[in-house]
Amino acid sequence: MTEAFARAKINLTLHVTGQRPDGYHLLDSLVVFADVGDRVRAEPAEALSLAITGPQAANLPVADDNLVLRAARTLGGQGARLTLEKHLPVASGIGGGSADAAAALVALARLWQVPLPDPAAVLKLGADVPVCLEGRAVRMAGVGEILTPLAAPLPEAWLVLANPGVSVPTPPVFKALARRDNPPMPDDLPGWPTVESLAAFLATQRNDLEPPAIALAPEIARTRAALAAQPGCLLARMSGSGATCFGLFAAEEAARAAAEAIGAEHPGWWVAPARMVG
């Protein structure tokens, strides 16, 4: 048996800078990961199969077009018994499906002792799959295929992730964008020796998908506000196309206290404190 961890992907920034003739949007995003996520296990078997377990399993029925199965087929036609232990909410802006696909590629490559697919094949699985396969802090550009490591490591930090239980499909959010030619981040990103300096930089940047997502799901604004109101929260923003929002914290104690407070006030929300992985 082999196993791989599918960490939540967090867009600290997400600038939509253009649109290609084929309809794909051009992005400029500072991406990190949170130390919370799903797990993919792979065991030898004659045929390819998938079972989904975990607290979010009921929200993701097994289907033939599941990204985990699509990733497996990208590696070849061998058999395996796959189990996806689902902890991240579905269609929530933190790359759950893409992270699961990347984890499936890693687990199956080990099980079958085959190389990972070429970058073009990985990108065909989804725009976020390449960055999830990378699994570290990068600047993501193009349609998700241009990944540039950061010049300096990010400071130690904590995140609180909160999702109000609303599923936000990505296409309507992009369709509702007011404009698609927004400015990118600076060409040269500064170093961030402290969490406070990182938060100050992020405050000058954007998630261009946040306004249209809030128009479609006003609960996102309430989620962001709940995070921003917590003691120690340096910045609150939506990740990806929503509806999950993150709060950035310097201290683990403050992050855990914030997650507990939000969870108590909003028992129907999915809330998780997590170390930021850069």
Curated annotation (Swiss-Prot):
ATP binds at residues 89-99. InterPro entries: GHMP_kinase_C_dom, GHMP_kinase_C_sf, GHMP_kinase_N_dom, IspE, Ribosomal_Su5_D2-typ_SF, Ribsml_uS5_D2-typ_fold_subgr. The active site is at residues 9, 128. It is an enzyme of class 2 (transferase). Pathway: Isoprenoid biosynthesis; isopentenyl diphosphate biosynthesis via DXP pathway; isopentenyl diphosphate from 1-deoxy-D-xylulose 5-phosphate: step 3/6. It catalyses: 4-CDP-2-C-methyl-D-erythritol + ATP = 4-CDP-2-C-methyl-D-erythritol 2-phosphate + ADP + H(+). GO terms for biological process: isopentenyl diphosphate biosynthetic process, methylerythritol 4-phosphate pathway; terpenoid biosynthetic process. It comes from the Bacteria. Keywords: ATP-binding, Isoprene biosynthesis, Kinase, Nucleotide-binding, Transferase. Its EC number is 2.7.1.148. One of its GO terms (molecular function) is ATP binding. NCBIfam families: ispE (TIGR00154), PRK14608.1 (NF011202). Catalyzes the phosphorylation of the position 2 hydroxy group of 4-diphosphocytidyl-2C-methyl-D-erythritol. Belongs to the GHMP kinase family. IspE subfamily. This is 4-diphosphocytidyl-2-C-methyl-D-erythritol kinase.
